[in-house]
């Protein structure tokens, strides 16, 4: 990159994944977060803009603090990349912060931690107000058992049992630093903090935890499932509705703001 001409910017954005067919641009022109964002950025930059994201999300998966970087020759003030871009974005996406960063900053490769929350409604009837906002099960769940199982995720492990068949990660070995499971007002929250995640990993974990909570899988069975390192014996992938990317960790020197998780979530 010619640093004399180009600037590198990092932006933090939030989006409603139910409105888009995932993050990545697609050849058939269906609405995606990346396509909408790059179109809006181009309006402000006056030139084509290509973005690099911290972590791609699937159809239906949300983000409260996704991080993206892009290069541009356009000299614009910081607010142009926030308010200006937001004026050109469709409903369901908003830029929260923008910051000019060092030319070597990389949204994906410089990230050393990622945070996800899965919001699950446990109720006999699914609330129409939570559709697309939370996963749902009609089953009564034993939160204590689920919490014990979730604790087994912490540490560096081979998570092949929770890996999608189409996952392109070079290694299934990842490190989970924190796995907290709580419940309030009929909503279960699974918070995971790890160095990186496999494709569908969080949704597959939630699917297995629901099996534990409903008595279809014991805590010991959950532990054995991890050790099996095979997707073949694992419970089905859970729905995307309740999955949120809630933060990305970067070295402090880059000054990337990680917003707090919204209180409503």
Swiss-Prot record:
Pfam families from the UniProt entry: PseudoU_synth_1 (PF01416)
GO molecular function, one term: RNA binding
Source domain of life: Bacteria
GO biological process: tRNA pseudouridine synthesis
Residues annotated as catalytic: 58
UniProt xrefs under CDD domains: PseudoU_synth_EcTruA
Keywords: Isomerase, tRNA processing
Lyase found in the keyword field: no
Quaternary assembly: Homodimer.
Cross-referenced HAMAP family: TruA (MF_00171)
Protein known as: tRNA pseudouridine synthase A
Gene transcribed to yield this protein: truA
């Amino acid at each position: 990159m010619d640093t004399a001409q180009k600037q590198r910017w990092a932006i933090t954005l939030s989006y409603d994944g139910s409105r888009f067919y995932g993050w990545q641009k697609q050849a058939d022109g269906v609405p995606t977060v990346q396509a909408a964002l790059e179109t809006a950025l181009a309006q402000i930059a006056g030139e084509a803009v290509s973005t690099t994201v911290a972590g791609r999300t699937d159809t239906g998966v949300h983000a409260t603090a996704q991080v993206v970087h892009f290069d541009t020759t356009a000299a614009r003030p910081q607010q142009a990349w926030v308010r200006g871009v937001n004026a050109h974005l469709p409903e369901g996406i908003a830029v929260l912060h923008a910051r000019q960063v060092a030319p070597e900053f990389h949204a994906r490769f410089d990230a050393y931690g990622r945070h996800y929350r899965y919001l699950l409604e446990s109720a006999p009837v699914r609330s129409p107000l939570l559709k697309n906002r939370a996963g749902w099960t009609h089953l009564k769940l034993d939160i204590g058992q689920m919490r014990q199982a979730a604790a087994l995720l912490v540490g560096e492990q081979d998570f092949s049992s929770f890996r999608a068949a189409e996952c392109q990660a070079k290694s299934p070995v990842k490190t989970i630093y924190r796995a907290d499971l709580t419940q309030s007002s009929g909503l279960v929250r699974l918070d995971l903090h790890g160095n990186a995640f496999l494709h569908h990993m969080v949704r597959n974990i939630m699917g297995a935890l629901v099996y534990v909570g409903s008595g279809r899988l014991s805590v010991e069975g959950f532990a054995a499932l991890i050790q099996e390192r095979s997707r073949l014996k694992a419970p089905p992938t859970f729905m995307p509705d309740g999955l949120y990317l809630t933060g990305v960790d970067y070295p402090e020197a880059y000054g990337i703001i990680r917003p707090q998780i919204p209180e409503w979530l």
